[in-house]
Amino acid sequence: MEGGRLGGAAASASAAAAADARGGMSGFAAPQHAIHTNLNNVQPTQVTDFGALAQSAGFRIEDLANLSTNGLFNLKSNAHTIINDPLQFENYVKSISPSNITTTATVTVVDPQTLVPQKGAQLNLVTIRTGNVENWGESTIADTSPRTDTSTDPDTDERNQMFEQGQLAAPTASDSSDRSKDKLDHKTLRRLAQNREAARKSRLRKKAYIQNLESSRLKLTQIEQELQRARQQGIFISTSSDQSHSASGNGALAFDMEYARWLEEHNKHINELRAAVNAHAGDNDLKSTVDSIMAHYNEIFKLKGVAAKADVFHVLSGMWKTPAERCFMWLGGFRSSELLKLLAGQLEPLTEQQLAGIANLQQSSQQAEDALSQGMEALQQSLAETLASGSLGPAGSSGNVANYMGQMAMAMGKLGTLENFLRQADNLRLQTLQQMQRILTTRQSARALLAISDYFSRLRALSSLWLARPRE
């Protein structure tokens, strides 16, 4: 019963307070305007930065809060509220511009008990520092005073929208920064790729330059060796301003170098053949080596043909051979018939058929050599007669000059046949070697090639010993 009486008394008091409030509405219109004016004059430093405070504390502005009647308020979890009197003050609140919001972290609270419904009444403002705020956190205690009410801040939506725009602007700036970084990264990668490509080209140029230097060094070494060999043979190359003589000299020097290279490779083939014969290799292995040596002989005959077109006298005189080899030379090379005589005693035992074949080959080679020798003698005789005719006439006459030019033209035509004689002599040598290979077996052919190589090697050694002999 006593509880019922207390409840009824509380209800009556609440009703009376509401009636008093409604009765005073008409007289409070002017103070509303005054309150609105005072709020406009509030210093920006006293306005609480609700957005920043809520963001730093981890709460949202639109959440609710409870304020006590003494001016201090308790914030619920993630909530801010403003306490209004039961009287309706719809027109006294003015939106606070974000430009006026500072980080002073103060809260201005209107105490509804100080509002007097009289014209020109002043609003009692209570400024509470953030140091006086209590009970931040998870609080579920609500103020049940009949003079308390919860309402949403009028500019909450606007602040939320501005806050969301700020959050959207941050990713945009981040995306712009990322794109800038991506551009820098792409530019850096492109520069690195260009640097790597330039370094690779530089290495290739350096490698090519080194290879050119190495090849030039090898060519210089070969030329020095040829000059040394030419000095040992008593060759003195004279310089001339005549372009044709210079060209022939270059051709002769090139042939000498090619012959030195050929001789070196020939010695390698002979060493391989000698090792195979000493190891008693099979006929198939020996045949491949013999064929390679025969092909190598064919190569030197081709080189001589090219050199004869540049300087036929150089090839015919055997200036690319040692002095001892030149002593036994015939038309720029060896005599086939003489070589077969030397091999007859080296290849025993031979069958009757092989002996007959060697004899016939030797006879035919001798006949061909005699024919070429006779043709060479006839050429020399004709050339001598051409140059000697008309040399007893008076010097300086126009007729003698014309006769002289005619004689030189005839002599030049006859010298052109020297190249033909040289080519026929080389063909005879090559055919003799090929016929000998057909008559002999593979192993006998290998022994014959070794004997020929040893013969010319001894001639070269004899020439070196002769040039190096002590002179009194």
Curated annotation (Swiss-Prot):
Its main location: nucleus. Residues 185-229 form the bZIP domain. InterPro entries: bZIP, bZIP_sf, TGA_domain. It is found in: Nucleus. Residues 136-190 are annotated as: Disordered. Residues 176-187 have a biased composition (Basic and acidic residues). The keyword DNA-binding applies. Signal peptide: none annotated. GO terms for cellular component: nucleus. Residues 143-153 have a biased composition (Low complexity). It holds the Pfam family DOG1. Residues 252-469 form the DOG1 domain. The keyword Nucleus applies. GO terms for molecular function: DNA-binding transcription factor activity; sequence-specific DNA binding. Residues 187-207 are annotated as: Basic motif. CDD domains: bZIP_HBP1b-like. Coiled coil: none annotated. Residues 213-227 are annotated as: Leucine-zipper. It comes from the Eukaryota. Keywords: DNA-binding, Nucleus, Plant defense, Transcription, Transcription regulation. GO terms for biological process: defense response; DNA-templated transcription. Belongs to the bZIP family. Transcriptional regulator involved in defense response. Isoforms 1 and 2 interact with NPR2/NH2. Isoform 2 interacts with NPR1/NH1 and NPR3/NH3. This is Transcription factor TGAL1. The gene is TGAL1.
